[in-house]
Amino acid sequence: MAAKDIRFGEDARARMVRGVNVLANAVKATLGPKGRNVVLEKSFGAPTITKDGVSVAKEIELADKFENMGAQMVKEVASKTSDNAGDGTTTATVLAQALIREGMKAVAAGMNPMDLKRGIDKAVTSAVEELKKISKPCSTSKEIAQVGSISANSDTDIGELIAKAMDKVGKEGVITVEEGSGLENELDVVEGMQFDRGYLSPYFINNPQSMQAELEDPFILLHDKKISNVRDLLPILEGVAKAGKPLLIVAEDVEGEALATLVVNTIRGIVKVCAVKAPGFGDRRKAMLEDMAILTGGTVISEEVGLSLEKATINDLGRAKKVQVSKENTTIIDGAGDTADIEARIKQIKAQIEETTSDYDREKLQERVAKLAGGVAVIKVGAATEVEMKEKKARVEDALHATRAAVEEGIVPGGGVALIRAKAAIAELKGANEDQNHGIAIALRAMEAPLREIVTNAGDEPSVVLNRVAEGTGAFGYNAANGEFGDMIEFGILDPTKVTRSALQNAASIAGLMITTEAMVAEAPKKEEPAAPGGGMGGMGGMDF
């Protein structure tokens, strides 16, 4: 086992604080409407330019191991806040730095670290309660657009695009962000259930303009096995032909004789058919077929439930108003399933979302909910260069997370005002002893830090602005974009409650741990062994070359 380098007490804490300050100073430069950009070197390709706090934090590694530990702990604040609420990373870092800086001073002055931590925790718990009281629900399109704009660094186009997407697919709907091909941002909305499987044969195409197979009012056959024998399909094909309707077949695969027969029937116009593979794999495929069955009012023909293809009748098939099948995707629009059944299925999937621990599974389950609930919106981000595209895409994703958080827990006045109001409401809070009172005072002082930093970045005097905001009430605050004072909600400067709450809680959590640190252990630096001197063979002097 390698030797360790151990630091204690004041020496350990001072090094840790140096690391915290390096990271926080780089991150906090990005805060507010007049925050600056940070340029990040990449090992290959052009550097990345960003105004996103968590992107800056993730890039920082320090040479000194003890300083690096401090920086990494604050990085955890930023990434945790980003994971929880999708935004507020810079605010969380600024709060953590303020708490740590003041807390370390108090520890150096001889106060009890545990009591300081208890005081900070008490103040934060009360402040969170106050934030919940100040919070207003975020329901209108205008408010959603404002939250999105603020999170996307005051880009109103992005805010409006997100509000439009939420209008189209509902608050529960899935909104994805992709890189577009033009200069403008675009919004594509896919109504109904879409999955990423296309037609099995181009002969199924019946609309040469769009190169799609379009089926109006079709029957839908759902099967979880391969179909290769045409005899299995005959009873259903005859029933569908009698009804004079088209047929969509969704199965694990359709091959050989069965596929050839379907193609011939389609070309001759006997029955209009299109066959596609079922989406997903394994258990997820079964679940998605079941979703389709509920959406279309049909049954999955599966041996597990005692149904076989040759015994299936037209009554086992699902129905929909329209189906569009392209080379890559299939979209089922307006399925004929019972609304109560669909809602029960959504409820069931939401329960699974609550229980799952895997981010990947959660994302897939949320997609399934959206497909059942009514659609998927795709925001295509446009930009002139790849560097701008990456930066813009990151901002759109941030804004999307923030608007979801706002819909979930409501909104508070932005620009650091909510924390000032929460601070005023708990100004009289007292702890069990003097050290706890000092911990409370540290937390109250730290709650001013985001507003101070926004004002500093805008080039104004923080103390003057802070006093003016503190004298006001409600949503009265300072608009750093134009230097005006007024109602933050009317200015459209809003923060999701969840973002402000998560930033404060995560900052206090890490600050409490760092204040109560007494020793730090790191790998001792290895001594470089001097290289052996190079030598030739002896007795070779005087040779002429």
Curated annotation (Swiss-Prot):
<comment type="subunit">
    <text>Forms a cylinder of 14 subunits composed of two heptameric rings stacked back-to-back. Interacts with the co-chaperonin GroES.</text>
</comment>
<feature type="binding site">
    <location>
        <position position="51"/>
    </location>
    <ligand>
        <name>ATP</name>
    </ligand>
</feature>
<dbReference type="Pfam" id="PF00118">
    <property type="entry name" value="Cpn60_TCP1"/>
</dbReference>
<keyword id="KW-0413">Isomerase</keyword>
<comment type="similarity">
    <text>Belongs to the chaperonin (HSP60) family.</text>
</comment>
<keyword id="KW-0547">Nucleotide-binding</keyword>
<dbReference type="GO" id="GO:0042026">
    <property type="term" value="P:protein refolding"/>
</dbReference>
<feature type="binding site">
    <location>
        <position position="415"/>
    </location>
    <ligand>
        <name>ATP</name>
    </ligand>
</feature>
<comment type="function">
    <text>Together with its co-chaperonin GroES, plays an essential role in assisting protein folding. The GroEL-GroES system forms a nano-cage that allows encapsulation of the non-native substrate proteins and provides a physical environment optimized to promote and accelerate protein folding.</text>
</comment>
<dbReference type="GO" id="GO:0005737">
    <property type="term" value="C:cytoplasm"/>
</dbReference>
<dbReference type="InterPro" id="IPR027409">
    <property type="entry name" value="GroEL-like_apical_dom_sf"/>
</dbReference>
<keyword id="KW-0067">ATP-binding</keyword>
<feature type="binding site">
    <location>
        <begin position="87"/>
        <end position="91"/>
    </location>
    <ligand>
        <name>ATP</name>
    </ligand>
</feature>
<keyword id="KW-0963">Cytoplasm</keyword>
<keyword id="KW-0614">Plasmid</keyword>
<protein>
    <recommendedName>
        <fullName>Chaperonin GroEL 2</fullName>
        <ecNumber>5.6.1.7</ecNumber>
    </recommendedName>
</protein>
<dbReference type="InterPro" id="IPR001844">
    <property type="entry name" value="Cpn60/GroEL"/>
</dbReference>
<dbReference type="InterPro" id="IPR027410">
    <property type="entry name" value="TCP-1-like_intermed_sf"/>
</dbReference>
<dbReference type="InterPro" id="IPR018370">
    <property type="entry name" value="Chaperonin_Cpn60_CS"/>
</dbReference>
<feature type="binding site">
    <location>
        <begin position="479"/>
        <end position="481"/>
    </location>
    <ligand>
        <name>ATP</name>
    </ligand>
</feature>
<feature type="binding site">
    <location>
        <position position="495"/>
    </location>
    <ligand>
        <name>ATP</name>
    </ligand>
</feature>
<dbReference type="InterPro" id="IPR027413">
    <property type="entry name" value="GROEL-like_equatorial_sf"/>
</dbReference>
<dbReference type="GO" id="GO:0005524">
    <property type="term" value="F:ATP binding"/>
</dbReference>
<dbReference type="GO" id="GO:0051082">
    <property type="term" value="F:unfolded protein binding"/>
</dbReference>
<dbReference type="GO" id="GO:0016853">
    <property type="term" value="F:isomerase activity"/>
</dbReference>
<dbReference type="InterPro" id="IPR002423">
    <property type="entry name" value="Cpn60/GroEL/TCP-1"/>
</dbReference>
<keyword id="KW-0143">Chaperone</keyword>
<dbReference type="GO" id="GO:0140662">
    <property type="term" value="F:ATP-dependent protein folding chaperone"/>
</dbReference>
<feature type="binding site">
    <location>
        <begin position="30"/>
        <end position="33"/>
    </location>
    <ligand>
        <name>ATP</name>
    </ligand>
</feature>
